């Protein structure tokens, strides 16, 4: 009863959780209610497409997680969606989606999505970088603006591992992401993220 006029005026309900993005579409998660409600999770990406971003929370609620990037058998894999912002007064920010896995012969995996901002807790964790191609291709870097850095992607037979995401600034501060493993035959491991 209270949601209908608020939805009509502001395009967002007063109370309630946002809808999740449908899997395989890369659709963004819906925003949570202005007062109470968590953001919906982003939908995973179709093959080679980016995952959807997580929806933002209102005053109280958690941000939605970013959707995973779509894996690809040829060409580049999709990046993970960004996590949604946490509640302005109370709530946890959403984690970034993992980058898609590349099954091609010479392409990199998808980048991990960034963790959501804000909330009463630390910002959301960055997504893990996608793994590189089976023969050639570097792993993508993990990302984060706050919270824990995402791990770097793993390379294939030849290629460097992705660098880990940097630790986010906050109280307490986030942890750095681990570097991805280099190629099985040739390639360097990725660097650990910075504090």
From Swiss-Prot:
One Pfam match: PGRS
Family to which the UniProt record says this protein belongs: Belongs to the mycobacterial PE family. PGRS subfamily.
Alphabetized UniProt keyword annotations: Calcium, Cell wall, Secreted
GO CC annotation, single: cell surface
Protein name, UniProt field: PE-PGRS family protein PE_PGRS61
Compartments (UniProt record): Secreted, Cell wall; Cell surface
Protein purpose: Mediates Ca(2+)-dependent up-regulation of the anti-inflammatory cytokine IL-10.
Organism: Mycobacterium tuberculosis (strain ATCC 25618 / H37Rv)
Subunit details: Interacts with human TLR2.
Keyword Metal-binding: no
Activity regulation description: Binding of Ca(2+) to PE_PGRS61 induces conformational changes and increases affinity for TLR2.
InterPro entries associated with the record: PGRS_rpt
